């Protein structure tokens, strides 16, 4: 499937979810031992943790949306990464969407983030902490040129390279999605230490943030992991293909109905949503 078709599918998946979903009616984590269930784009979570809003190392954006829930592994990853960044004097980590209290489908903006193992992190590290007003209405910093072929040199900073590299080197991280132009710049800057680049995957948009995804926890037996990224640093022909014009004759895919929920997620909805 070519990249244009993939983009249209992603857009349709997002558009199909614009109507309110029953998952929004669950306002607190479902009690129980932490279990990520299903796939990243069709799943849920039992026993989610709440990311503490107050921290000296990070700040949480758009708290009014209440998307700061996730598997304990995700909460620990955020705390671990932000401590590393702080200890290196790089700035404050800005945390975007994680998941809803029980995971599940959003009413827009995300096709994934459903199992408590995904988090969006802004690609800027302010030295001065943001105000409450800034956090509620954050201003994204678009790092990619208008033509989409490279990063904006005046905006690309060594600490952003280091932030992505630190995240990719974390033992629990399986993928990081960034714009192809950002991946390209990482490839140029990486030098000889390149193993971590395998986890950094080019994807549509993601011009101002990275989307970090963790592996399925070993004790989440109903969690469905993605296949590992292809071997290598991903800096060759695969990356360059993202900068090629779409092939002629690309047709808009048919609108698809979301797949059935995993049985455990459907049972969770049946029990907790009237």
UniProtKB/Swiss-Prot annotation:
| Cofactor dependence | Zn(2+)
Return the EC number.
3.4.24.-
The superkingdom of the source organism is Bacteria
Which residues bind Zn(2+) 2 per the record? Answer: 147, 150
Example of a GO cellular component annotation carried by this entry = outer membrane-bounded periplasmic space
Gene3D superfamilies, A to Z = 3.30.1380.10
Keywords on this record?
Disulfide bond, Hydrolase, Metal-binding, Metalloprotease, Periplasm, Protease, Signal, Zinc
Q: What does the record's cofactor remark say about binding?
A: Binds 2 Zn(2+) ions per subunit. Zn(2+) ion 1 is bound in the active site. Zn(2+) ion 2 is bound at the dimer interface by residues from both subunits.
- The cysteines covalently paired via disulfide bonds are 44-265, 187-235, 216-223
Q: Where is this region: Disordered?
A: 227-274
An MF annotation (GO) of this entry = metalloendopeptidase activity
**List of residues binding Zn(2+) 1:** 110, 113, 120, 211
Q: Where is the signal peptide?
A: 1-19
GO terms in the biological process aspect are:
peptidoglycan metabolic process; proteolysis
Q: Where in the cell is it found?
A: Periplasm
Hey, which family's this protein in? Belongs to the peptidase M74 family.
Self-association state and partner proteins as the record states: Dimer.
Q: What does this protein do?
A: Murein endopeptidase that cleaves the D-alanyl-meso-2,6-diamino-pimelyl amide bond that connects peptidoglycan strands. Likely plays a role in the removal of murein from the sacculus.
Name of the protein described by the UniProt record: Penicillin-insensitive murein endopeptidase
Q: What is the gene called?
A: mepA
């Amino acid at each position: 499937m070519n990249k244009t078709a993939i983009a249209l599918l992603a857009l349709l998946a997002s558009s199909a979810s614009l109507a309110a979903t029953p998952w929004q009616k669950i306002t607190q984590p479902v009690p129980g031992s932490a279990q990520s269930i299903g796939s990243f784009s069709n799943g849920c979570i039992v026993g989610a943790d709440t990311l503490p809003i107050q921290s000296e190392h990070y700040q949480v954006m758009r708290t009014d949306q209440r998307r700061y829930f996730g598997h304990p592994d995700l909460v620990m990853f955020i705390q671990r990464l932000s401590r590393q960044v702080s200890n290196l004097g790089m700035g404050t980590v800005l945390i975007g969407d994680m998941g809803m209290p029980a995971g599940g489908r959003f009413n827009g903006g995300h096709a994934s983030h459903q199992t408590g193992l995904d988090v969006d992190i802004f690609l800027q590290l302010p030295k001065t902490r943001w105000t409450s007003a800034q956090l509620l209405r954050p201003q994204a910093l678009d790092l990619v040129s208008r033509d989409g072929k490279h990063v904006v040199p005046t905006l690309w900073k060594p600490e952003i390279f280091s932030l992505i590299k630190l995240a990719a080197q974390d033992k629990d991280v399986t993928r990081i999605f960034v714009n192809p132009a950002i991946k390209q710049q990482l490839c140029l800057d990486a030098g000889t230490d390149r193993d971590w680049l395998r986890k950094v995957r080019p994807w549509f948009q993601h011009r101002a943030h990275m989307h970090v995804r963790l592996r399925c926890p070993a004790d989440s037996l109903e969690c469905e992991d993605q296949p590992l990224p292809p071997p290598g640093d991903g800096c060759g022909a695969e990356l360059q293909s993202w900068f090629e014009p779409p092939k002629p004759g690309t047709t808009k895919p048919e609108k698809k109905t979301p797949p059935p929920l995993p049985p455990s997620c459907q049972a969770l909805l049946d029990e907790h949503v009237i």
